[in-house]
């Protein structure tokens, strides 16, 4: 038996192809994911950012076991998503992962109070058996998310931010290894969004829940240590954020962007790089001692650049 991956989320060469019908009635294949690779280790808080049509929603559907990939590898919380039966998928969604969706109607039952919504999640998942244990767990979760004042309120009586924080409490009621959030701030203003994201950071930090936020909003990346950009069905770049001390002992917040190199050596150049240099079809590469240079195909390669073991190119006479 192969060893289980030590990552909480692992995708290798993930492909998802949909068959759709064109206007003329012909069948057309649409490739939503094109060999996507992603690894998220236990306890990480990661944002996956991408424009509409980039493949991020398809990725989340696969990670939540609501959809199956066409090919590749997908593991979440120690479960192989490609081999699970339907009964195993139901158990996986109830016990191993938690969810926070953009729409309140998907997170909370409108006719139940905040405490009743959390208690219902506990009852469904089998956590905190017994009424007393459930009440204690409900109180703990609402206190953690700072919405204990909403305990007796129904969703229509709460603000958007309060609804989402209660939704997070519902999402972690089953003590999941992984929390998946789909556009959790999509319907909120900037200030409220920041409060909700800080609540997710608090859950990640205090409970150690591996958290993945899928969003189209680049501002979300300011609240996480790692941001993965998806473009054309693949991971294209990553931004890693850290806090360092300068020579005077003052804190500096540093963000470093990296291109993602896949297993066969492919990478996607950022759109602004491509546009700035007017890169098209072919580019020239040059191997330097400590980096690789990229030039537009119509420009001559700098003479100082060399490829190892490559014979000199002679211009035709």
Question: Where do the language-model regions lie?
Answer:
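Helix-to-loop junction immediately C-terminal to a conserved catalytic motif
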Residues: 64
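Conserved ABC transporter NBD signature motif
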Residues: 72-80
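Conserved ABC ATPase "signature" region
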Residues: 80, 119, 126, 131-150
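ABC ATPase NBD coupling module
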Residues: 81-98, 131
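Conserved signature/switch motifs of ABC ATPase nucleotide-binding domains
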Residues: 94, 153-156, 173-174
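Short coil-to-helix segment of the ABC ATPase nucleotide-binding domain corresponding to the Q-loop/switch region
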Residues: 111-120
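ABC ATPase C-loop
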Residues: 147, 151, 166, 171-172
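Catalytic Walker B motif of ABC-type/P-loop ATPase nucleotide-binding domains
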Residues: 179-182
């Amino acid at each position: 038996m192969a060893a289980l991956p030590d990552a909480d989320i692992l995708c290798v060469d993930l492909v998802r192809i949909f068959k759709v019908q064109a206007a003329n009635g012909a069948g057309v294949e649409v490739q939503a994911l094109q060999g996507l690779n992603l690894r998220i280790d236990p306890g990480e808080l990661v944002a996956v950012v991408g424009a509409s049509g980039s493949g991020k929603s398809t990725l989340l559907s696969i990670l939540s076991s609501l959809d199956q990939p066409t090919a590749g590898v997908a593991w979440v919380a120690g479960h192989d998503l490609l081999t699970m039966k339907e009964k195993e998928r139901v158990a996986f969604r109830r016990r191993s992962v938690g969810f926070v969706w953009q729409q309140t109607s998907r997170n909370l039952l409108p006719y139940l109070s905040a405490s009743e919504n959390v208690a219902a999640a506990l009852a469904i998942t089998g956590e905190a058996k017994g009424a007393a244990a459930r009440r204690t767990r409900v109180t703990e979760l609402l206190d953690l998310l700072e919405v204990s004042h909403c305990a007796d309120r129904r969703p229509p009586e709460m603000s958007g931010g309060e609804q989402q924080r209660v939704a997070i409490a519902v999402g972690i009621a089953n003590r999941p290894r992984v929390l998946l959030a789909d556009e959790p701030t999509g319907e909120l203003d900037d200030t409220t969004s920041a409060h909700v994201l800080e609540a997710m950071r608090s859950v990640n930090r205090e409970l150690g829940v591996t958290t993945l936020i899928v969003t189209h909003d680049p501002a979300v990346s300011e609240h996480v240590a790692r941001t993965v950009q998806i473009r054309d069905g693949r991971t294209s770049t990553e931004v890693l954020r850290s806090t360092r001390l300068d020579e005077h002992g003052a804190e500096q917040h540093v963000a470093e962007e990296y291109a993602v190199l896949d297993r066969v050596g492919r990478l996607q150049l950022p759109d602004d790089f491509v546009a700035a240099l007017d890169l098209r079809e072919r580019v020239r590469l040059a191997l330097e001692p400590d980096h690789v240079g990229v030039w537009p195909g119509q420009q001559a390669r700098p003479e100082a650049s060399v490829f190892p073991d490559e014979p000199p190119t002679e211009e035709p006479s």
